[in-house]
Design a protein with these regions (language model features):
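Solvent-exposed, non-transmembrane regions of membrane-associated and secreted proteins
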Residues: 2-261
Length: 261
């Protein structure tokens, strides 16, 4: 009787699907898809979610493949629920650079981000931002692996946190916590450095930050130092890749390389 009741409740919660299945008989709607996504999914079955960034007043659908005018989920990120790091590539219309490129604008801006899958909503708070090269040639054949979806080992997590703090344009009071924090990487274009990407970093269920101090020695890709005729103080640290767990029991590990991205 209890099982039957649960089944009945579950069926009633998704009763709206009957209408859409009748209207779109050739569409295979995922089990559990929310009603607010059904019409969009019927027209574009590569839809995997939605992103809303209050700080730049952007809201748009997320697709599983890149297309002009839409956000896209990284190929290594799960569409079902947040990974340790979920990466979303934004269209040009989402001007996150203007909202989060300085400590002053960051503090004044709404730092909230709502990342929605077809099944649930997840709230993030931006904690920092940085520039990364789009082409490996602009940083000695290297691209910082910010979009690592698999869980890192504790030591790799510490190294990753250090890598981020050096790259952040400013540092808030937030300290990343291993085995607790999940991150979102919002990757947009840059009008300041057209050859680079601008990346805003958010933490799941994080609180708005009220303090931020400009980083006086930002780690940029090598091309920035070349263009500005400066010596790169971080030149000996280029080439870091994380060690991640390769099994669900977290007993086996693997060191990633450029081929994994």
């Amino acid at each position: 009787p209890v099982a039957n009741a649960v089944t009945a409740v579950s069926a009633s919660k998704t009763a709206y699907l009957r209408q859409y299945k009748k209207e779109y008989p050739d569409v295979d709607f995922p089990a559990g898809i929310r009603e607010s996504f059904c019409e969009q999914y019927a027209g574009q079955s590569s839809t995997v979610g939605k992103i809303a960034i209050a700080g730049c007043e952007y809201s748009g659908w997320i697709l599983s493949t890149k297309s002009i005018g839409n956000a896209a989920l990284d190929k290594n990120s799960s569409a079902e629920e947040p990974d340790w790091i979920t990466t979303v590539y934004l269209p040009q219309s989402a001007n996150i650079e203007k909202a989060f490129s300085s400590s002053e604008s960051y503090i004044k801006t709404d730092q909230g981000v709502v990342y929605s899958t077809l099944f649930n909503d997840y709230n993030y708070n931006i904690i920092g931002a940085f520039y990364v090269n789009a082409n490996a040639k602009d940083d000695g054949g290297y691209v910082f692996p910010y979009n690592t979806a698999k869980k890192m080992t504790g030591s790799s997590f510490s190294q990753f946190s250090d890598e981020l703090s050096h790259r952040f344009l400013y540092n808030s009071d937030y300290k990343l916590k291993y085995n607790k924090d999940k991150l979102i990487m919002l990757v947009g274009s840059s009008s300041v450095y057209p050859d680079f990407k601008f990346v805003a970093v958010g933490v799941l269920n994080g609180k708005a930050q009220v303090n931020a101090k400009a980083n006086d020695q930002i780690q940029y890709p090598q091309a920035w130092y070349d263009k500005n005729n400066q010596s790169n103080p971080y030149r000996f640290s280029i080439g870091w890749y994380p060690t991640v767990y390769s099994d669900s029991s977290e007993k086996e590990t693997a060191v990633l390389s450029a081929r994994d991205y």
